[in-house]
């Protein structure tokens, strides 16, 4: 009942005094994919290209306006194209003038914008995928519609979302770490 418990006294190791012995760490600003880096620019270009091609493929069909989900996909990809293109220009500017884009307000704006566009793009891609499956598998009226174009545009919208997700997560993580 009154058993003794051992006392635990952790012993701290002395910090290294020689700067050469200190472990090197990765600074948050060195992460690829952050705003103002070449990786961030690559992600923005990929987002823009995938969303732009999805928009072009969907808009090339004549019967997309008859389905609300496809109209939503077109609207979401337009917004995704505008957002990604504008941030790609900001990234190019930051790379050219070697400027840091890690201002708290800028990172907060990037994270909020990426979150909104990610939610819209993912919702549009999911709704378009549902309608495409309905048309192709359930109703079997793919011969009358442009199912190949619908599937391609939906897949490209998902790819745009996959390219957007790392940007959002890195910006959100950077914002939360401050």
From Swiss-Prot:
Localisation per UniProt entry: Cell membrane
* Extracellular topological segments: 59-69, 127-152
This chain's protein is named CASP-like protein 5A1
Chief location: membrane
- Family label: Belongs to the Casparian strip membrane proteins (CASP) family.
| Spans through the membrane | 38-58, 70-90, 106-126, 153-173
Q: How does it sit in the membrane?
A: Multi-pass membrane protein
Quaternary data: Homodimer and heterodimers.
Where are the annotated segments for Disordered?
Answer: 1-24
Listed A to Z, the keywords are: Cell membrane, Membrane, Transmembrane, Transmembrane helix
What's the superkingdom here? Eukaryota
Give the source lineage, highest ranks first: Eukaryota, Viridiplantae, Streptophyta, Embryophyta, Tracheophyta
- Is the keyword Transmembrane helix in the record? yes
**Has the keyword Amino-acid biosynthesis been applied to this entry?**
no
> Which organism's genome codes for this protein?
Brachypodium distachyon
